[in-house]
Amino acid sequence: YEWETCDYMKALELYQSRSEKYVKKQGEDLSSILSGITSFKGDVHLTFCPMITEQDLMAYDSLPGIEYNREVAKLMDRRIHAGYRLTPNNFIAHDIRFGKHEFKGDRYTDEQKDRFLHHLKKLEKYDVDEPEVLMDIFLGIYSNPVDNCFERNH
């Protein structure tokens, strides 16, 4: 998605879970699902990666259980990241989070950045002790896919 549908809720949950166990309220999952379905997403890209086959898994047969599971998870991540399409918002968040202009011009315009900054500004309405931490978590939701996708290519 160009716009993460529950980005504010996700950021707040992660923020709260840093200092206390986050306990979901009754019906919160259903509310998140409905919000995710009905909320504006902007551009949407759907990719189906190649199926993980028995032959793929055989490469890890000699590994003990936990290592086997880790390697299968890495394989799944590689498949997902290979088909992931990054959006301008991912690159904007990455540049803001790390104080750079690495992707400006190539991956996003000033207009796109202004739109993202307007969206980001809405975080100010949340009364939290460490707003900079909440902002970093929020930016991470959008910027982490950049790191994940670039790691697979390097």
Q: What kind of feature is each model-predicted range?
A:
Residues 1-154:
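Membrane-interfacial terminal anchoring regions of lipid-handling membrane enzymes
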